[in-house]
């Protein structure tokens, strides 16, 4: 429940009490061990790791801008009129409820904002403004570290970016104009930041894929990306 998550993040709900209740509920209701373990791991594993990163490296993360991006977030990213269907859906959902799932935050909103080269401080502010469970200790590592890779890899070995293919596979959104724009931005990003990606064994092949791409397809991707960026940066 999102509202319990808010109480947990601010410290009004004790994590030990929640763990005790969860374990007892799992025992009484014969919940599969893998489901119980996954839930508990999020509470005392990943969640505490994020808290630890904030305490130890939060100041470093929030004052770094690895990519050097300075663009402001335009109005369309607040009212859900970007024309990018999965993104607009997530924006409208968080506007209505104050909450979107972690994967939506990371792989839809954060992913697309990184491809648009927004200032990480702007991205941090956006998430703090729209999320009911937003607190500084949660958002600093999740935005500057995971989502925008502004810390240069303190928390992860690669940025969480993808083409539209990942979004399509993980959802029921159909291909369309939005996916053409997303792919254009993705390949533009790979090309523009090739000096970084070529050194990463997990992503080097994507640079090679772009280099081997048909010249007309390559130019179409880049033109689509530039047209979209010019549009949003001139709102």
How would you describe each model-predicted region?
Residues 2-3:
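Short, small-residue-biased leader/transition segments that mark boundaries at the very start
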Residues 12-235:
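C-terminal catalytic domain of photolyase/cryptochrome flavoproteins
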């Amino acid at each position: 429940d999102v509202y319990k998550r808010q109480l947990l993040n601010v410290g009004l709900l004790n994590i030990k009490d929640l763990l005790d209740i969860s374990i007892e509920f799992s025992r009484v209701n014969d919940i599969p061990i893998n489901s119980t373990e996954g839930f508990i791991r999020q509470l005392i594993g990943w969640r505490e790791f994020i808290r630890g990163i904030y305490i130890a490296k939060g100041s470093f993360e929030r004052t770094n801008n690895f990519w050097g991006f300075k663009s402001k977030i335009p109005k369309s990213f607040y009212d859900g009129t970007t024309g990018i269907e999965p993104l607009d859906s997530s924006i409208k959902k968080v506007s209505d409820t104050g909450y979107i799932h972690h994967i939506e935050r990371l792989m839809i909103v954060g992913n697309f904002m990184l491809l648009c080269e927004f200032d990480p401080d702007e991205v941090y502010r956006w998430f703090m403004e729209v999320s009911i469970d937003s607190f500084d200790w949660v958002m600093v590592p999740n935005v500057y570290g995971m989502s925008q890779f502004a810390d240069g890899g303190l928390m992860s070995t690669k940025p969480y970016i993808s083409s539209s293919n990942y979004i399509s596979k993980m959802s029921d959104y159909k291909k369309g104009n939005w996916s053409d724009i997303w792919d254009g931005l993705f390949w533009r990003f790979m090309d523009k930041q090739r000096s970084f990606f070529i050194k990463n064994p997990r992503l080097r092949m994507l640079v090679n894929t772009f280099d081997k791409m048909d010249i007309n397809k390559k130019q179409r991707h880049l033109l689509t990306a530039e047209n979209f960026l010019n549009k949003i940066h001139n709102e």
